[in-house]
UniProtKB/Swiss-Prot annotation:
Start and end residues of each UIM domain: 47-61
Residue positions, PTM N6-acetyllysine: K242
GO CC, alphabetical: cytoplasm; cytosol; microtubule
InterPro entries listed in its UniProt record: TAP42/TAP46-like_sf, TAP46-like
Residue ranges with Low complexity bias: 292-301
The protein's name: Immunoglobulin-binding protein 1
Region (Interaction with MID1): 226-291
Compositional bias segments (type: Basic and acidic residues): 313-330
Species whose genome carries this gene: Rattus norvegicus (Rat)
Length: 340
């Protein structure tokens, strides 16, 4: 009797789902920092409720891959979103030391949700790469011509289609929300409402997985230099190299010196006087002032040279005048009367 009373006190599956879904909606519009205590408490609470809901779904065996989407009751379609909600809440956990674990766990939740929707043919989409289908994807890509260009074009087209579908789904959901939540909608509208939610979360999950893969790559690339430095530090240290001097540089230093100018210790005159004092230089090596006779002889020679130059100029002038006269007075110019 006590056990049955405890079971009645436990929250039921609809309550777990609606409470956790409401917590996620509150977190989506919250203005507080994601790392605040209030936000993280709601994240932990939502994950705890969804974990219980997932356990109940597993015990009830509510979904089976052997059945079609039409065989699932309309009211039970919403429980297919449990893994997607788990992935969304896991992404909101803030712990830098466990960020990689959170990303990998969130990716597993999103993949689980997408796999279920793919099996039930909720919408047409391509499953992201996983460990199970990675070999098939690699084989298909290797057989394609220009795989990078084709993959980029297909991804771009898929994003455009998802964006269009997202706008259409959100518009249709806003039209059905009030009727379904108030209980006035019939089974057909309820079914359409939850199918639209599933398609909306398919687009969200695909976008989140792309973002997760990029962040995981960044985190792994950031940790790889640390691992390399740790491996290098574990290697035994080599003895330091001894300095050596090149023979060429040593010989060059002997010829040209050390490469910097030496400072003078005396002037040239001081050096000359010092050598003359010790008899290291002959007397004729020192210039003496000229004598008076030498000056007179030099002056006479200079005067004679000037006189010779003047005589040469006069003689040259006479010769030029004589040449000019011969040009104007040809031979026989003065004896014209005796011409026969």
């Amino acid at each position: 009797m006590a056990a049955s009373e405890e079971e009645l006190l436990l929250p039921r599956l609809p309550e777990l789902f609606e409470t956790s879904k409401k917590l996620l909606e509150e977190l989506e519009v919250a203005t507080e920092p994601t790392g605040s205590r209030t936000i993280q408490d709601k994240v932990s609470k939502g994950l705890e409720l969804l974990e219980k809901a997932a356990g109940m779904l597993s015990q009830l065996d509510l979904f089976s891959r052997n059945e079609d989407l039409e065989e699932i009751a309309s009211i039970d379609l919403k429980y297919l979103m449990v893994p997607a909600l788990q992935g969304a809440l896991t992404m909101k956990q803030v712990n830098p030391s466990k960020r990689l674990d959170h990303l990998q766990r969130a990716r597993e939740h999103f993949i689980h949700f997408l796999t279920q929707c793919h099996c039930y043919h909720v919408a047409e989409f391509q499953l992201p790469q996983t460990k199970n289908n990675s070999a098939e994807n690699n084989t298909a890509r290797s057989s394609m011509a220009y795989p990078n260009l084709v993959a980029m074009a297909s991804q771009r087209q898929a994003k455009i289609e998802r964006y269009k579908q997202k706008k259409e789904v959100e518009h249709r959901l806003s039209a059905l929300k009030s009727a379904v939540e108030s209980g006035q909608a019939d089974d057909e509208r309820v079914r359409e409402y939850y199918l639209l939610h599933l398609r909306r979360w398919i687009g969200i999950s695909l976008e989140e997985i792309e973002s997760i893969d990029q962040e995981i790559k960044i985190l792994k690339d950031k940790d790889s230099p640390r691992e390399e430095s740790a491996c290098q530090s574990s290697l035994p240290e080599k003895p330091p190299m001894k300095p050596f001097i090149l023979t060429r540089n040593k010989a060059q230093a002997k010829v040209f010196g050390t490469g910097y100018p030496s400072l003078a210790t005396m002037t040239v005159s001081d050096w000359y006087e010092q050598h003359q004092k010790y008899g290291a230089l002959p007397d004729r090596g020192i210039a003496k002032p000229p004598s008076a006779d030498f000056q007179r002889a030099a002056q006479q020679q200079e005067d004679q040279e000037q006189k010779d130059e003047e005589n040469e100029e006069k003689a040259l002038h006479r010769m030029r005048e004589w040449d000019d006269w011969k040009d104007t007075h040809p031979r026989g110019y003065g004896n014209r009367q005796n011409m026969g």
